[in-house]
Regions:
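N-terminal glycine-/serine-/threonine-rich phosphate-binding loop
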Residues: 25-78
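Short secondary-structure boundary segments
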Residues: 13, 28-30, 128
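Short glycine-enriched, charge-decorated loop/helix-capping segments at active-site entrances
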Residues: 139
Length: 139
């Protein structure tokens, strides 16, 4: 787990540098953020907000971001479906996966994205919840 945390922090620092770079040529229009471990996330959402990125999020991550005074699009509003199974199923929906897996250069994909009003996700930040601890708790 320490390796994963170190990699997470490296990713966050890299993304922060990218977002604040004057030579950034790709605008991140929509970001999906749903994480269990929120340490280090603050500067990233601040930078995304400053860059004008629409942030989509779930549950605790949404609350964390809103506590920073940043507007968040609720994934539940996007999907018109609630988080289920104790919060373990939140983003498993065609409107989420379509936004992640779509190919912008593909005319058919673009037509379906428009038809079903699916946002393109330019950035996805997720991590894993502590599965073993959750399992041991009986959840």
């Amino acid at each position: 787990i320490n390796y994963i945390i170190r990699r997470w922090k490296i990713l966050l620092l890299t993304l922060l540098i990218y977002l604040t770079s004057k030579t950034n040529t790709m605008r991140i229009q929509n970001a999906l953020i749903s994480v269990f471990h929120k340490d280090g996330l603050g500067p990233i959402v601040d930078a995304l907000n400053a860059a004008g990125t629409n942030i989509y999020s779930t549950g605790g991550t949404q609350a964390f971001i809103e506590e920073r005074g940043i507007s968040v699009e609720r994934v539940e509003d996007l999907t018109s479906y609630p988080s289920i199974l104790g919060g373990r199923v939140k983003t498993l929906h065609p409107k989420v996966f379509g936004g992640i897996l779509s190919r912008r250069e593909n005319e058919s994909d673009r037509a379906q994205m428009d038809e079903f009003d699916i946002p393109y996700f330019d950035l996805v930040i997720v991590d894993l919840y502590p599965f073993e601890a959750t399992l041991a708790s009986g959840a």
